Amino acid sequence: MKPSPQFFLAAFLSLILQTGICYGIKWIALSKTPSSLALNQTQHCKQLEGLVVSQVQLCRSNLELMQTIIQAAREVIKTCRKTFSDMRWNCSSIELAPNYLLDLERGTRESAFVYALSAAAISHTIARACTTGDLPGCSCGPIPGETPGPGYRWGGCADNLNYGLIMGSKFSDAPMKMKKSGSQANKLMHLHNSEVGRQVLKASLEMKCKCHGVSGSCSIKTCWKGLQELRDIALDLKNKYLSATKVVHRPMGTRKYLVPKDIDIRPVKETELIYLQSSPDFCMKNEKVGSHGTQDRQCNKTSNGSDSCDLMCCGRGYNPYMDKVVERCHCKYHWCCYVTCKKCERTVERYVCK
């Protein structure tokens, strides 16, 4: 029996509900903003790529923030590529912003990581910009209430995490709070993962100190609260990516909640990344599912990790090639005070997947 038009319509609507495309990370396209765009007038906000209406409005009312947010978008791309350089999915599709492939358009494990990282990055970059004096609307973070130990004193300029979280979340969460921003399940998932990113950022705030004293004795330490580098935050989020939980949107009482798919009904943990759609293995190129494949990717023959030739090449084998490396050698220290080196060339064997 031939399926009816109503069947195809229902299937189409079901697909929309499953994928639930959301615009939450399209702002990463700000990384492509030309340096020639001064961003000193409100009409410039309309020229920025990847923003929804509410983000354009935030741009107009917070022009001084936009260069910092543009820098955050660039940091997201650089950090994601570096963090996943040894994995089959190497975050290369993030550079297609705002026109992502399905690996980031659907509610996948990969999109969970990018949402978390982008939320952490924008707050991190704003908090640091306050410290360096790049933003007129904020300054150093507050001095902690607790008394430091003997030989320590509060000073320096703390990263303004509170301001970074407030302004960063206003901007990065704005698309998910629109009425037309995909299915309710996807909005809940993206907001959850963004909050996980900010939690990891908050947990990275640590005491940093500088020594003072006669002849380097370090008799007194001036300390402040500072955030870890974004690359360290990304590594924590990568571990959460590897252990992410698949969820479903299930009725519980009078409302629907995201709950783990394969576990007895329980609330989703606030500290775990979650996803709705399973990902492919990313072995073969298939743009329909956002997979670039691993053909011609470099692999490590001696590694036991994710960059090993066995895992990276998905059992297809690999080809060796010789690569010339130029490096500094025969370095000498000269009094006083400089070092001279020669340049040496050596040949190393590398491997790429078939």
UniProtKB/Swiss-Prot annotation:
Transmembrane stretches, start-end: none
GO cellular component: cytoplasm; extracellular matrix; extracellular space
PROSITE patterns, per the entry: WNT1
Keyword hit for Disulfide bond: yes
Gene3D superfamilies listed in its UniProt record: 3.30.2460.20
InterPro entries the record matches: Wnt, Wnt_C, Wnt_CS
Subcellular location: Secreted, Extracellular space, Extracellular matrix
Positions annotated as glycosylated: N40, N90, N300, N304
Major location (coarse): secreted
SMART domains for this protein: WNT1
Disulfide bond annotation, renumbered to this chain: C80-C91, C130-C138, C140-C157, C209-C223, C211-C218, C283-C314, C299-C309, C313-C353, C329-C344, C331-C341, C336-C337
GO biological process annotation, one example: paraxial mesoderm formation
PTM comment text: Palmitoleoylation is required for efficient binding to frizzled receptors. Depalmitoleoylation leads to Wnt signaling pathway inhibition.
Pfam families: wnt
Sequence similarity: Belongs to the Wnt family.
PANTHER family, sorted: PROTEIN WNT-11 (PTHR12027:SF7), WNT RELATED (PTHR12027)
Name used for this protein in its record: Protein Wnt-11
Organism lineage string: Eukaryota, Metazoa, Chordata, Craniata, Vertebrata
Gene that encodes it: WNT11
